[in-house]
Amino acid sequence: MAMSKIATLAGLLASAGLVAGHGYVTKMTIDGEEYGGWLADSYYYMDSPPDNYGWSTTVTDNGFVSPDAFGTDDITCHRGATPGALSAPVTAGSKIDITWNTWPESHKDNQGPIINYLAKCNGDCSSADKTSLEFVKIQAEAIVDASTNTWVTDELIENSFTTSVTIPASIAPGNYVLRHEIIALHSAGQQNGAQAYPQCLNLVVSGSGTDNPSGTPGTQLYSANDEGIVFDIYSNPTSYPMPGPELYSG
Protein backbone atom coordinates (compact mmCIF):
# COMPACT_ATOMS: atom_id res chain seq x y z
CA MET A 1 0.00 0.00 0.00
CA ALA A 2 1.34 3.46 -0.89
CA MET A 3 2.57 5.54 2.04
CA SER A 4 0.01 8.28 1.33
CA LYS A 5 -2.81 5.75 1.61
CA ILE A 6 -1.37 4.34 4.83
CA ALA A 7 -1.18 7.83 6.29
CA THR A 8 -4.76 8.56 5.23
CA LEU A 9 -5.98 5.32 6.79
CA ALA A 10 -4.13 6.04 10.03
CA GLY A 11 -5.68 9.48 10.16
CA LEU A 12 -9.16 8.08 9.67
CA LEU A 13 -8.64 5.51 12.40
CA ALA A 14 -7.36 8.18 14.77
CA SER A 15 -10.38 10.35 14.02
CA ALA A 16 -12.70 7.43 14.64
CA GLY A 17 -11.07 6.93 18.02
CA LEU A 18 -11.74 10.54 18.92
CA VAL A 19 -15.47 10.37 18.26
CA ALA A 20 -16.25 6.79 19.29
CA GLY A 21 -18.34 6.47 22.43
CA HIS A 22 -17.52 4.37 25.45
CA GLY A 23 -20.61 3.28 27.40
CA TYR A 24 -23.50 3.90 29.79
CA VAL A 25 -24.80 2.65 33.15
CA THR A 26 -27.10 -0.38 32.96
CA LYS A 27 -27.93 -0.85 36.64
CA MET A 28 -27.11 -0.16 40.25
CA THR A 29 -27.08 -2.78 42.98
CA ILE A 30 -27.96 -1.91 46.58
CA ASP A 31 -27.94 -4.54 49.33
CA GLY A 32 -28.20 -7.27 46.73
CA GLU A 33 -31.17 -5.73 44.89
CA GLU A 34 -30.75 -4.58 41.28
CA TYR A 35 -32.26 -1.34 39.97
CA GLY A 36 -32.23 -0.85 36.22
CA GLY A 37 -30.80 2.14 34.41
CA TRP A 38 -31.69 3.64 31.04
CA LEU A 39 -30.54 1.23 28.33
CA ALA A 40 -29.72 3.97 25.88
CA ASP A 41 -29.23 1.88 22.75
CA SER A 42 -32.59 0.09 23.05
CA TYR A 43 -35.10 1.98 25.22
CA TYR A 44 -34.83 5.09 23.06
CA TYR A 45 -36.42 3.21 20.17
CA MET A 46 -39.35 1.81 22.17
CA ASP A 47 -42.79 3.43 22.08
CA SER A 48 -43.26 2.57 25.76
CA PRO A 49 -39.93 1.87 27.46
CA PRO A 50 -40.16 0.43 30.97
CA ASP A 51 -40.07 2.69 33.99
CA ASN A 52 -36.62 2.64 35.51
CA TYR A 53 -34.32 4.37 37.95
CA GLY A 54 -31.97 5.99 35.47
CA TRP A 55 -32.62 9.23 33.64
CA SER A 56 -33.51 8.73 30.00
CA THR A 57 -31.29 10.27 27.33
CA THR A 58 -31.13 10.62 23.57
CA VAL A 59 -27.64 9.08 23.52
CA THR A 60 -27.87 6.00 21.28
CA ASP A 61 -24.17 5.83 20.39
CA ASN A 62 -22.48 5.29 23.79
CA GLY A 63 -21.56 8.93 23.28
CA PHE A 64 -20.11 11.69 25.43
CA VAL A 65 -20.35 15.38 26.26
CA SER A 66 -17.40 17.41 25.01
CA PRO A 67 -15.95 20.40 26.91
CA ASP A 68 -17.48 22.92 24.52
CA ALA A 69 -20.88 21.78 25.88
CA PHE A 70 -19.97 21.96 29.58
CA GLY A 71 -21.98 25.17 29.94
CA THR A 72 -25.15 23.51 28.63
CA ASP A 73 -27.69 21.20 30.26
CA ASP A 74 -26.12 18.25 28.41
CA ILE A 75 -23.42 18.00 31.06
CA THR A 76 -25.93 17.64 33.89
CA CYS A 77 -27.25 14.13 33.15
CA HIS A 78 -26.14 13.67 29.51
CA ARG A 79 -27.74 14.71 26.22
CA GLY A 80 -31.51 15.12 26.20
CA ALA A 81 -31.83 13.79 29.76
CA THR A 82 -35.21 13.54 31.51
CA PRO A 83 -35.88 12.12 35.00
CA GLY A 84 -36.40 8.44 35.67
CA ALA A 85 -39.83 7.47 36.99
CA LEU A 86 -38.56 5.37 39.89
CA SER A 87 -36.25 5.91 42.86
CA ALA A 88 -34.13 3.26 44.57
CA PRO A 89 -34.01 3.08 48.37
CA VAL A 90 -30.62 3.33 50.06
CA THR A 91 -29.47 3.94 53.62
CA ALA A 92 -26.91 6.68 54.12
CA GLY A 93 -23.55 5.04 54.74
CA SER A 94 -24.33 2.18 52.35
CA LYS A 95 -22.47 1.24 49.19
CA ILE A 96 -24.00 1.28 45.72
CA ASP A 97 -22.47 -0.86 42.98
CA ILE A 98 -22.81 0.72 39.54
CA THR A 99 -22.47 -1.37 36.39
CA TRP A 100 -21.72 -0.10 32.89
CA ASN A 101 -22.60 -1.91 29.67
CA THR A 102 -18.99 -1.68 28.50
CA TRP A 103 -15.81 0.39 28.66
CA PRO A 104 -12.87 0.23 26.23
CA GLU A 105 -10.26 -2.30 27.30
CA SER A 106 -7.46 -0.64 25.34
CA HIS A 107 -5.31 0.65 28.20
CA LYS A 108 -5.13 4.36 27.41
CA ASP A 109 -8.59 4.58 25.83
CA ASN A 110 -10.25 3.67 29.11
CA GLN A 111 -8.39 5.82 31.61
CA GLY A 112 -9.84 8.74 33.51
CA PRO A 113 -11.49 9.70 36.79
CA ILE A 114 -14.79 8.39 38.14
CA ILE A 115 -16.66 11.14 39.98
CA ASN A 116 -19.92 10.90 41.96
CA TYR A 117 -22.27 13.67 43.02
CA LEU A 118 -25.58 13.98 44.88
CA ALA A 119 -28.25 16.62 44.28
CA LYS A 120 -31.39 16.96 46.40
CA CYS A 121 -34.58 16.90 44.35
CA ASN A 122 -36.75 19.00 46.71
CA GLY A 123 -39.71 16.78 45.83
CA ASP A 124 -40.07 13.56 43.90
CA CYS A 125 -37.08 13.05 41.62
CA SER A 126 -39.39 11.87 38.83
CA SER A 127 -40.38 15.51 38.34
CA ALA A 128 -36.99 17.08 39.05
CA ASP A 129 -35.88 20.05 36.95
CA LYS A 130 -32.28 19.40 35.93
CA THR A 131 -31.61 23.13 35.65
CA SER A 132 -32.34 23.58 39.37
CA LEU A 133 -30.31 20.63 40.67
CA GLU A 134 -27.20 21.52 42.68
CA PHE A 135 -24.58 18.80 42.93
CA VAL A 136 -22.33 17.92 45.85
CA LYS A 137 -19.22 15.89 45.02
CA ILE A 138 -19.23 12.87 47.36
CA GLN A 139 -16.55 10.64 45.82
CA ALA A 140 -13.79 11.09 43.26
CA GLU A 141 -11.09 8.64 42.21
CA ALA A 142 -8.47 8.68 39.47
CA ILE A 143 -4.95 7.21 39.68
CA VAL A 144 -4.97 4.16 41.94
CA ASP A 145 -1.31 3.14 41.56
CA ALA A 146 1.07 5.44 39.69
CA SER A 147 3.85 2.84 39.70
CA THR A 148 1.78 0.54 37.50
CA ASN A 149 -0.18 3.31 35.74
CA THR A 150 -3.41 1.89 37.14
CA TRP A 151 -6.49 4.10 37.13
CA VAL A 152 -9.88 3.53 38.72
CA THR A 153 -11.26 2.81 35.24
CA ASP A 154 -8.83 -0.10 34.91
CA GLU A 155 -10.39 -1.52 38.06
CA LEU A 156 -13.86 -0.94 36.58
CA ILE A 157 -12.98 -3.16 33.64
CA GLU A 158 -11.38 -5.84 35.82
CA ASN A 159 -14.54 -5.92 37.95
CA SER A 160 -16.93 -6.70 35.07
CA PHE A 161 -17.52 -2.99 34.32
CA THR A 162 -18.67 -2.40 37.91
CA THR A 163 -17.55 0.29 40.35
CA SER A 164 -19.00 1.54 43.63
CA VAL A 165 -19.88 4.68 45.54
CA THR A 166 -20.73 5.09 49.22
CA ILE A 167 -23.50 7.48 50.22
CA PRO A 168 -22.13 9.59 53.10
CA ALA A 169 -23.64 8.60 56.45
CA SER A 170 -23.97 12.27 57.41
CA ILE A 171 -26.27 13.18 54.50
CA ALA A 172 -29.83 14.06 55.52
CA PRO A 173 -32.64 11.75 54.37
CA GLY A 174 -34.49 12.73 51.21
CA ASN A 175 -34.89 12.31 47.48
CA TYR A 176 -31.64 12.66 45.55
CA VAL A 177 -30.21 12.38 42.07
CA LEU A 178 -26.95 10.45 41.98
CA ARG A 179 -24.77 11.86 39.20
CA HIS A 180 -22.17 9.23 38.31
CA GLU A 181 -19.56 10.17 35.73
CA ILE A 182 -16.47 8.95 33.95
CA ILE A 183 -14.26 11.44 32.12
CA ALA A 184 -12.18 9.71 29.44
CA LEU A 185 -8.81 11.40 28.97
CA HIS A 186 -7.24 9.68 25.96
CA SER A 187 -7.72 12.83 23.82
CA ALA A 188 -7.61 15.38 26.65
CA GLY A 189 -4.11 16.56 25.81
CA GLN A 190 -5.70 18.84 23.24
CA GLN A 191 -8.40 21.48 23.70
CA ASN A 192 -11.95 20.06 23.68
CA GLY A 193 -10.59 16.52 23.75
CA ALA A 194 -11.88 15.22 27.10
CA GLN A 195 -15.01 13.06 26.99
CA ALA A 196 -17.54 13.27 29.83
CA TYR A 197 -20.05 10.47 30.38
CA PRO A 198 -22.52 11.73 33.02
CA GLN A 199 -25.19 9.26 34.16
CA CYS A 200 -28.04 10.11 36.56
CA LEU A 201 -30.05 7.77 38.78
CA ASN A 202 -32.75 8.47 41.36
CA LEU A 203 -32.41 7.58 45.05
CA VAL A 204 -34.46 7.80 48.23
CA VAL A 205 -31.92 8.14 51.04
CA SER A 206 -32.85 7.14 54.58
CA GLY A 207 -30.85 7.42 57.78
CA SER A 208 -30.10 9.72 60.69
CA GLY A 209 -27.81 12.21 58.95
CA THR A 210 -28.53 15.92 59.16
CA ASP A 211 -26.20 17.50 56.59
CA ASN A 212 -27.63 19.45 53.67
CA PRO A 213 -24.46 20.75 51.98
CA SER A 214 -24.74 23.39 49.30
CA GLY A 215 -24.02 22.25 45.76
CA THR A 216 -23.13 23.46 42.29
CA PRO A 217 -25.39 23.58 39.20
CA GLY A 218 -24.43 21.05 36.56
CA THR A 219 -23.56 23.76 34.07
CA GLN A 220 -21.00 25.19 36.51
CA LEU A 221 -19.20 21.98 37.49
CA TYR A 222 -16.41 22.32 34.93
CA SER A 223 -14.99 24.66 32.34
CA ALA A 224 -13.23 23.64 29.15
CA ASN A 225 -9.85 24.91 30.36
CA ASP A 226 -9.82 23.33 33.82
CA GLU A 227 -6.85 21.28 34.94
CA GLY A 228 -8.00 17.70 34.71
CA ILE A 229 -10.12 18.53 31.66
CA VAL A 230 -7.08 19.52 29.62
CA PHE A 231 -4.62 16.81 30.69
CA ASP A 232 -1.88 14.77 29.04
CA ILE A 233 -2.46 11.18 30.08
CA TYR A 234 0.51 10.02 27.98
CA SER A 235 3.09 11.79 30.17
CA ASN A 236 3.05 8.99 32.79
CA PRO A 237 1.44 11.21 35.44
CA THR A 238 1.82 10.37 39.12
CA SER A 239 -1.09 12.57 40.19
CA TYR A 240 -4.25 14.00 38.69
CA PRO A 241 -5.88 17.40 39.38
CA MET A 242 -9.52 16.43 40.00
CA PRO A 243 -11.86 18.86 38.20
CA GLY A 244 -15.03 20.25 39.70
CA PRO A 245 -16.00 21.58 43.13
CA GLU A 246 -14.35 20.47 46.36
CA LEU A 247 -15.08 17.03 47.75
CA TYR A 248 -17.70 16.91 50.50
CA SER A 249 -15.92 15.87 53.68
CA GLY A 250 -18.90 15.13 55.94
Curated annotation (Swiss-Prot):
One Gene Ontology cellular component: extracellular region
Cofactor field: Cu(2+)
UniProt key word Cell membrane: no
Gene3D superfamilies, alphabetized: 2.70.50.70
Catalytic activity annotation: Endohydrolysis of (1->4)-beta-D-glucosidic linkages in cellulose, lichenin and cereal beta-D-glucans
Applied biotechnology: Lignocellulose is the most abundant polymeric composite on Earth and is a recalcitrant but promising renewable substrate for industrial biotechnology applications. Together with cellobiose dehydrogenases (CDHs) an enzymatic system capable of oxidative cellulose cleavage is formed, which increases the efficiency of cellulases and put LPMOs at focus of biofuel research.
E.C. code: 3.2.1.4
Induction: Expression is induced by cellulose and xyloglucan. Expression is also slightly induced by chitin, a main component of fungal cell walls with a structure closely related to cellulose. The promoter contains two consensus sequences for xlnR binding sites (5'-GGCTAA/G-3'). The degenerate binding motif 5'-SYGGRG-3' that binds to creA involved in carbon catabolite repression is also present in the promoter.
Signal peptide, first to last residue: 1-21
Disulfide bond found in the keyword field: yes
Disulfide feature: C77-C200, C121-C125
Subcellular location(s) of the protein: Secreted
Top-level division of the source organism's lineage: Eukaryota
InterPro entries assigned: AA9, AA9_LPMO
Gene Ontology MF terms in the entry: hydrolase activity, acting on glycosyl bonds; metal ion binding
Cofactor, free-text remark: Binds 1 copper ion per subunit.
Effect of deleting the gene: Results in about 25% reduction in fungal growth on sugarcane straw but not on Avicel. Results in 60% reduction in activity using phosphoric acid-swollen cellulose (PASC) as the substrate.
Enzyme kind, highest EC tier: hydrolase
UniProt-annotated binding residues for O2: D51, H186, Q195
An annotated GO BP: cellulose catabolic process
Family under the similarity heading: Belongs to the glycosyl hydrolase 61 family.
Stated role: Lytic polysaccharide monooxygenase (LMPO) that depolymerizes crystalline and amorphous polysaccharides via the oxidation of scissile alpha- or beta-(1-4)-glycosidic bonds, yielding C1 or C4 oxidation products. Catalysis by LPMOs requires the reduction of the active-site copper from Cu(II) to Cu(I) by a reducing agent and H(2)O(2) or O(2) as a cosubstrate. Major secreted component of the extracellular cellulolytic system.
Name of the protein in its database record: AA9 family lytic polysaccharide monooxygenase F
